Curated annotation (Swiss-Prot):
Top-level taxon: Bacteria
Subcellular location: Cytoplasm
UniProt family annotation: Belongs to the ClpX chaperone family. HslU subfamily.
Protein name as it appears in the record: ATP-dependent protease ATPase subunit HslU
Binding partners and assembly: A double ring-shaped homohexamer of HslV is capped on each side by a ring-shaped HslU homohexamer. The assembly of the HslU/HslV complex is dependent on binding of ATP.
Binding site for ATP: 18, 60-65, 255, 320, 392
Main location: cytoplasm
CC terms in the record's Gene Ontology section: HslUV protease complex
CDD domains: RecA-like_HslU (cd19498)
Molecular function GO labels: ATP binding; ATP hydrolysis activity; peptidase activity; proteasome-activating activity
Keywords: ATP-binding, Chaperone, Cytoplasm, Nucleotide-binding, Stress response
Organism listed in the record: Shewanella sp. (strain W3-18-1)
Source organism phylogeny: Bacteria, Pseudomonadati, Pseudomonadota, Gammaproteobacteria, Alteromonadales
GO biological process: protein unfolding; proteolysis involved in protein catabolic process
Pfam families with a match to the protein in the record: AAA, AAA_2
Length: 442
C-alpha cells in the first residue's frame, strides 16, 4: 500500500494531468485515508468505512487519466471497469460480482510478485546450482568420483565464470517446467463453486511434465529463477494475503457510470441500466463475493465512479446509489490555455513524443511558442464548434499537423522543421474554419 502523503500524490498527478485540482485532492485524500485507517486499532478500524467518490465532468478532461495514474501510485489491488460492460443478474452478459473476482486475480498476481521478490536471492542460488549441474553432470558411479577436491574446484571456477557473465552465450540442455494452460468455464450465477472445482480438476489433469530444452545460459537462468521462486511461494499463504489485500486496500474505478442512468420513461426491464445499479448497491455497501480463491468481503473496498453526465444528471442515478457515493467532485472543461499547458508541461507530452519519434529518422522537429499557442487555439476552436471531446482533440489535430512530416521523414534524414504559427496556419486554418471539414476530419 502506498504511504505517500496527499501533497506527494497530487504532485505526482500534476506531472501527467493539467488542472483538475479538486479531483486530484479528493483521490489523494481517499488514498491517504486507506493508509490512515490501517494505523488504527483492529476493532476501531472495522468501523471506518471508505468515503466513495463520484467524479463529474465532460469527456476528455482527465477522469480516466487520473484513474490510470492512481493505479500506478496505489501499490494496491486496483481495477478500472466500464459500467456499460455489465448486465443485471440472470441475463446474458457479465454480472457486477465479476469486478471483485477480477480484482482478486489482480491481488493474487501482485502478492505473488511481492513474495517471489522476497525469495529471489534463494531462487537465484537454486537456479545457479541447476545450471552448474547441467554444465558439470554428477558422476553416475562412485569409482568415477575419486577426486572430489578437483571436482569441487572445477565447480567453483565455473561458478565464478557464470557470475561474471562469461558463460552467458553458452548453450545447455535443461529441464524447464511447462506453463499451465488456463481453462475458462462459463457458468450461470450462483454456481461459481462448481466452476472452481472443475477448473481445479482440469488444471491437475493437464499438468505437463518438465520438458528438456536447449537454450543459452542467460535465458535459462531467468527461467529457472522464476521456476524456483514459484516453488518457494506458499500458495495458501498467498491466497490469504491476497484476499486480505483486496478487502483492506482494494480500489475499484467505475468509469462511464452516467451511461447506466435511466433516461426517461421506458417500458420493459432495464437490463443494462437500472438493473446494474441495483446489483452494484450491495457491492458498494458491503457484501461477500465468492471467488475461486475464497470469500471476499467488499465492506472496505474504495469505489471511485466517474461519468460525463452530458445526457443524464447525477440525480438520475437511483437514490440508494447516490447515497453510497458521498463525495462529489466536478472537473472543469478545458480552456485554450489548458491545451497549451497539456502540449508542453506533462512528462512525455505530445510535442516531446513527436520530437522523439521524428528523431529516430534523423529529422529534427522544433515547436515554437507561437506554434504551440496556435495548435492549442485550433483544438479549442474545433471543440467549441463541434463536439467537445476535451484533450483528445489534441491528438487528432497534432496527427493532422504532423502528417506530411511523418510521411516524408524517412526520406529527409538530417532535415529540420520548425512548427511555428505560420506552419500551423498553413496546415490547419482551412480545416478549422470550415465546420463541415472539422466535423469529419478533426
Amino acid at each position: 500500500m502506498s504511504e505517500m502523503t496527499p501533497r506527494e500524490i497530487v504532485h505526482e498527478l500534476d506531472a501527467h494531468i493539467i488542472g483538475q485540482k479538486k479531483a486530484k485532492r479528493s483521490v489523494a485524500v481517499a488514498l491517504r485515508n486507506r493508509w490512515r485507517r490501517m494505523q488504527l486499532d483492529a476493532d476501531f478500524r472495522q468501523e471506518v468505512t471508505p468515503k466513495n467518490i463520484l467524479m463529474i465532468g465532460p469527456t476528455g478532461v482527465g477522469k480516466t487519466e487520473i484513474a490510470r495514474r492512481l493505479a500506478k501510485l496505489a501499490n494496491a489491488p486496483f481495477i478500472k471497469v466500464e459500467a456499460t460492460k455489465f448486465t443485471e443478474v440472470g441475463y446474458v452478459g457479465k454480472e457486477v460480482e465479476q469486478i471483485i473476482r477480477d480484482l482478486t486475480d489482480i491481488a493474487i498476481k501482485l502478492t505473488r510478485e511481492q513474495q517471489m521478490g522476497k525469495c529471489r536471492q534463494l531462487a537465484e542460488e537454486h537456479a545457479e546450482e541447476r545450471i552448474l549441474d547441467a554444465l558439470l553432470p554428477k558422476p553416475k558411479n562412485d569409482w568415477e568420483s575419486t577426486d572430489t577436491d578437483t571436482g569441487s574446484n572445477t565447480r567453483q571456477i565455473f561458478r565464478k565464470k557464470l557470475r561474471e557473465g562469461q558463460l552467458d552465450d553458452k548453450e545447455i540442455d535443461i529441464d524447464v517446467a511447462q506453463p499451465q494452460i488456463g481453462i475458462e468455464i462459463m457458468s450461470p450465477p450462483g454456481m461459481e463453486e462448481m466452476t472452481n472445482q472443475l477448473q481445479s480438476l482440469f488444471k491437475n489433469m493437464g499438468q505437463a511434465p518438465a520438458k528438456r530444452r536447449k537454450m543459452k545460459i542467460k535465458e535459462a537462468f531467468k527461467l529457472l529463477i522464476e521456476e524456483e521462486a514459484a516453488k518457494l511461494v506458499n500458495q495458501e499463504d498467498l491466497k490469504e494475503q491476497a484476499i486480505e489485500m483486496v478487502e483492506q486496500h482494494g480500489i475499484v474505478f467505475l468509469d462511464e457510470i452516467d451511461k447506466i442512468c435511466k433516461r426517461g420513461e421506458t417500458s420493459g426491464p432495464d437490463v443494462s441500466r437500472e438493473g446494474v445499479q441495483r446489483d452494484l448497491l450491495p457491492l458498494v455497501e458491503g457484501c461477500t463475493v465468492t471467488t475461486k480463491h475464497g470469500m471476499v468481503k467488499t465492506d472496505h473496498i474504495l469505489f471511485i465512479a466517474s461519468g460525463a453526465f452530458q445526457m443524464a444528471k447525477p440525480s438520475d442515478l437511483i437514490p440508494e446509489l447516490q447515497g453510497r457515493l458521498p463525495i462529489r467532485v466536478e472537473l472543469d472543461a478545458l480552456s485554450a490555455d489548458d491545451f497549451k499547458r497539456i502540449l508542453t508541461e506533462p512528462h512525455a507530452s505530445l510535442t516531446e513524443q513527436y520530437v522523439a519519434l521524428m528523431g529516430t529518422e534523423g529529422v529534427k522537429v522544433e515547436f515554437t511558442e507561437s506554434g504551440i499557442e496556435s495548435i492549442a487555439k485550433a483544438a479549442w476552436q474545433v471543440n467549441e464548434r463541434t463536439e467537445n471531446i476535451g484533450a483528445r482533440r489534441l491528438h487528432t489535430v497534432m496527427e493532422k499537423l504532423m502528417e506530411d512530416i511523418s510521411y516524408e521523414a524517412s526520406d529527409k534524414s538530417g532535415s529540420a522543421f520548425v512548427i511555428d504559427a505560420d506552419y500551423v496556419s498553413a496546415h490547419l486554418d482551412n480545416l478549422v474554419q470550415d465546420e463541415d471539414l472539422s466535423r469529419f476530419i478533426l
